[in-house]
């Protein structure tokens, strides 16, 4: 999950800027990224946060969360092709990056979903390509390290369908052949969620044996770009995400990994924004623990897509404007509530649990711009504030 943030420059020199939504900006504290990053990947080892790839190309950066005044330090460049939406997690003191999508070579006609895996060693500051292939496409998936040293992976786009669609789209000149182009797009985007064949297994990768396994099937529609928070050892909350291109779900699920299997439990959906505005769900939101609660912030959706899908119009986002959300929700383990607002609508950045709240790193704004700002969403169970 990668996502983004607000306007730090406006906060310089301001001790506290109150927002009508209940958010407050405090004194500057967290350093900006060297470059804007959206659709990248992130992981954490101890007090070190790592972010890169996506719009940053092969760049990779680290921040000491215990000493943020040192700023982001550039680490060794990723050695694979530049990739968006890779699944990344830490295990055994190293960072593993799986799949993602991009061009295999600079002169490739269309992007593909990669089936490759790489490992980063902070000790040697170096990347290596692993001698393995992902069993399925894992672009848009979420990865998380387990206590036994393995890595669990949820969701992911179907490589065969994704690659073929982008190759077919790339082969048509939409200006010269508008009808053929529209027919192709309508055909792909008009399928029901099940037809996209997104990964519905909870895959598990074992770095020690360099092998793959499964923790069982997801009983729900699989998601890409959901928000994810660790609730405890082996317990993970998956929130919202896409169920097909352009259509999100408001559902949230608790996954408990026990005795070699993943056990799923549906919890409360994200709440409607008002009596007149139903919850569309979001993709690319930020998430993490803040005290006893889980915060989910931002993300992107298409207002009206749920209504279209309910009416059987499966190209649900056709003609709809994409919306970058600024809503922040808090989950107490039973119910959700609206906690406040981000400084601006953001999605597809990184988030890290931090003392007192959730650290929001980079992401994409409503103009599609990759952002550099970093800030802390502080939550005391009642009020939300923003610390830069």
From Swiss-Prot:
Keywords of this entry: Carbohydrate metabolism, Isomerase, Kelch repeat, Periplasm, Repeat, Signal
Role summary: Converts alpha-N-acetylneuranimic acid (Neu5Ac) to the beta-anomer, accelerating the equilibrium between the alpha- and beta-anomers. Probably facilitates sialidase-negative bacteria to compete successfully for limited amounts of extracellular Neu5Ac, which is likely taken up in the beta-anomer. In addition, the rapid removal of sialic acid from solution might be advantageous to the bacterium to damp down host responses.
Kelch repeat residue intervals: 48-92, 94-147, 149-186, 187-232, 236-285, 307-356, 358-387
Taxonomic classification: Bacteria, Pseudomonadati, Pseudomonadota, Alphaproteobacteria, Hyphomicrobiales
Pfam family, one: NANM
Record family assignment: Belongs to the NanM family.
Main location: periplasm
GO terms for cellular component: periplasmic space
Subunit structure comment from the entry: Homodimer.
InterPro entries (UniProt xref): Kelch-typ_b-propeller, NANM, NanM_proteobact
Cited NCBIfam families: muta_rot_YjhT (TIGR03547), PRK14131.1 (NF010730)
Disulfide bond annotation, renumbered to this chain: none
The encoding gene: nanM
Record EC number: 5.1.3.24
Protein name: N-acetylneuraminate epimerase
Signal peptide: 1-26
Annotated localization: Periplasm
The UniProt record lists the keyword Protease: no
HAMAP family, per the entry: NanM (MF_01195)
Domain of life: Bacteria
Reactions catalysed: N-acetyl-alpha-neuraminate = N-acetyl-beta-neuraminate
A single MF term (Gene Ontology): racemase and epimerase activity, acting on carbohydrates and derivatives
């Amino acid at each position: 999950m990668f996502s983004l943030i607000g306007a730090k420059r406006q906060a310089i020199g301001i001790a506290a800027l109150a927002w009508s939504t209940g958010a407050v900006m405090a004194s500057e504290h967290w350093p900006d990224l060297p470059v804007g990053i959206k659709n990248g990947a992130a992981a954490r080892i101890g007090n070190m946060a790592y972010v890169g790839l996506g719009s940053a190309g092969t760049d990779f950066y680290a921040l000491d969360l215990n000493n943020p005044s040192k700023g982001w330090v550039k680490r060794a460049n990723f050695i694979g092709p530049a990739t968006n939406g890779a699944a990344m997690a830490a295990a055994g003191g190293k960072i593993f990056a799986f799949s993602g999508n991009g061009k295999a070579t600079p002169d490739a006609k269309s992007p593909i979903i990669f089936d490759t895996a790489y490992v980063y060693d902070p000790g040697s500051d170096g990347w290596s390509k692993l001698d393995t292939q992902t069993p399925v496409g894992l672009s848009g998936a979420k990865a998380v390290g387990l206590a036994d040293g393995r890595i669990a992976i949820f969701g992911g786009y179907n490589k065969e369908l994704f690659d073929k669609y982008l190759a077919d789209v790339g082969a048509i000149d939409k200006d010269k052949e508008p009808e053929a182009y529209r027919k192709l797009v309508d055909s792909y985007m008009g399928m029901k969620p099940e037809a996209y064949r997104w990964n519905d297994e909870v895959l598990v990768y074992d770095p020690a044996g360099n092998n793959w396994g499964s923790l069982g099937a997801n009983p729900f529609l699989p998601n890409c770009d959901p928000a994810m928070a660790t609730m405890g050892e082996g317990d993970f909350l998956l929130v919202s995400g896409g169920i097909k291109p352009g259509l999100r779900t408001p559902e949230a699920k608790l996954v408990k990994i026990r005795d070699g299997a993943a056990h799923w439990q549906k919890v409360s959906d994200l709440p409607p924004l008002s009596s007149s505005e139903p919850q569309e769900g979001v993709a690319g939101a930020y998430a993490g623990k803040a005290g006893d609660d889980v915060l989910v912030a931002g993300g992107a959706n298409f207002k009206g897509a749920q209504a279209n899908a309910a009416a059987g119009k499966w190209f649900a986002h056709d003609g709809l404007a994409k919306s970058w959300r600024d809503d922040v929700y808090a989950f107490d383990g039973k119910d959700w509530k609206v906690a406040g607002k981000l400084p601006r609508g953001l999605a597809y950045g990184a988030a890290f649990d931090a003392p007192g709240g959730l650290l929001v790193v980079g992401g994409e704004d409503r103009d599609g711009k990759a952002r550099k700002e970093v800030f802390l969403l502080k939550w005391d169970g009642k009020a939300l504030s923003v610390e830069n």
